[in-house]
């Protein structure tokens, strides 16, 4: 009798560029887990139908990327606290009782990557650029690290202020407009997607100093536009979001399989793969 192989997947649209199947296949090999992991692309507005079909046909869990994270939030029967706070779900798991739990591992992926790079978050002044879903998903894990202050800056200041209000009981956080940022920070995190179109967020280079560590959530084969700008302004170090991608994947894998895979080797493989 052949052993039943557990099925996992990632949902997104577009999904052709996703590195998740590559990452999870390597995780499975590393931890000797029998599973398959595929990329699925439902039409816009079709996520819930596709997810229902996936789970009813024996799917055990899935990752969810743009534009379906809010849909996944609605789809889950239960939510972890961090998913509830993030208002979005990037990981779904079918429990033994048939219930589907939604989690958000993005913030944990970011924090783990920063800590792996030996970035000090405790007592640091942290600037988070952008106030969209990507920003909201990482605020609570960042505040859990006890920074001196987390400043969320966004083109529309009211969105940043709203996020600050939402998370005010979790730590020292304030929201302002991008044009109001007029001082340097220890850690600067870019959650805006402006770099994907070669643009920079409309913020002054006064944010950078020689002790600043910069983190851009986007990644590519070379240095990101934002990180290049930061390096040109003399920052201490600049990292892209590839480590966050691998970190959030490791956290999802842990939720599904109860095992935490190592990330360093896989990050090296992925980087090599990107640069080919």
Curated annotation (Swiss-Prot):
Shikimate binds at residues 18-20, 65, 90, 106, 219. One of its GO terms (biological process) is shikimate metabolic process. The active site is at residue 69. InterPro entries: Aminoacid_DH-like_N_sf, NAD(P)-bd_dom_sf, SDH_C, Shikimate_DH, Shikimate_DH-bd_N, Shikimate_DH_fam, Shikm_DH/Glu-tRNA_Rdtase. Its EC number is 1.1.1.25. It catalyses: shikimate + NADP(+) = 3-dehydroshikimate + NADPH + H(+). Keywords: Amino-acid biosynthesis, Aromatic amino acid biosynthesis, NADP, Oxidoreductase. The keyword S-adenosyl-L-methionine does not apply. NADP(+) binds at residues 81, 130-134, 154-159, 217, 241. It is an enzyme of class 1 (oxidoreductase). It holds the Pfam family Shikimate_DH. GO terms for molecular function: NADP binding; shikimate 3-dehydrogenase (NADP+) activity. The keyword Cell membrane does not apply. GO terms for cellular component: cytosol. Pathway: Metabolic intermediate biosynthesis; chorismate biosynthesis; chorismate from D-erythrose 4-phosphate and phosphoenolpyruvate: step 4/7. Belongs to the shikimate dehydrogenase family. Involved in the biosynthesis of the chorismate, which leads to the biosynthesis of aromatic amino acids. Catalyzes the reversible NADPH linked reduction of 3-dehydroshikimate (DHSA) to yield shikimate (SA). Homodimer. HAMAP family: Shikimate_DH_AroE. PANTHER family: BIFUNCTIONAL 3-DEHYDROQUINATE DEHYDRATASE_SHIKIMATE DEHYDROGENASE, CHLOROPLASTIC (PTHR21089:SF1), SHIKIMATE DEHYDROGENASE (PTHR21089). This is Shikimate dehydrogenase (NADP(+)). It comes from Vibrio atlanticus (strain LGP32) (Vibrio splendidus (strain Mel32)). The gene is aroE.
């Amino acid at each position: 009798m052949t052993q039943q192989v557990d099925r996992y997947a990632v949902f997104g649209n577009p999904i052709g560029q996703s590195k998740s199947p590559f990452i999870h296949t390597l995780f499975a090999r590393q931890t000797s887990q029998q599973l398959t992991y595929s990329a699925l692309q439902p039409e816009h507005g079709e996520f819930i139908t596709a997810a229902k079909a996936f789970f009813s046909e024996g799917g055990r869990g899935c990752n969810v990327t743009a534009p379906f994270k809010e849909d996944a939030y609605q789809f889950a029967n239960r939510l972890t606290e961090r998913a509830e706070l993030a208002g979005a779900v990037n990981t779904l798991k079918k429990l033994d009782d048939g219930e589907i739990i939604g989690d958000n591992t993005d913030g944990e992926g970011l924090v783990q990557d920063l800590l792996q790079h030996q970035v000090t978050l405790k007592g640091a002044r942290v600037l988070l650029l952008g106030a969209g879903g990507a920003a909201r998903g990482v605020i609570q894990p960042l505040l859990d690290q006890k920074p001196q202050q987390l400043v969320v800056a966004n083109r529309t200041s009211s969105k940043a202020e709203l996020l600050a209000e939402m998370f005010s009981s979790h730590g020292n956080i304030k929201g302002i407009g991008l044009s109001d940022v007029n001082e340097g920070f220890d850690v600067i995190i870019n959650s805006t997607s402006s770099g994907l179109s070669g643009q920079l967020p409309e913020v002054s280079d006064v944010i950078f100093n020689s002790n600043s560590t910069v983190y851009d959530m986007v990644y590519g084969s070379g240095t990101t536009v934002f990180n290049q700008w930061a390096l040109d302004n003399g920052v201490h170090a600049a990292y892209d979001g590839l480590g966050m991608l691998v970190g959030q994947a490791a956290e999802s894998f842990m939720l599904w399989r109860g095992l935490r895979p190592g990330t360093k080797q896989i990050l090296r493989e992925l980087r090599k793969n990107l640069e080919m």
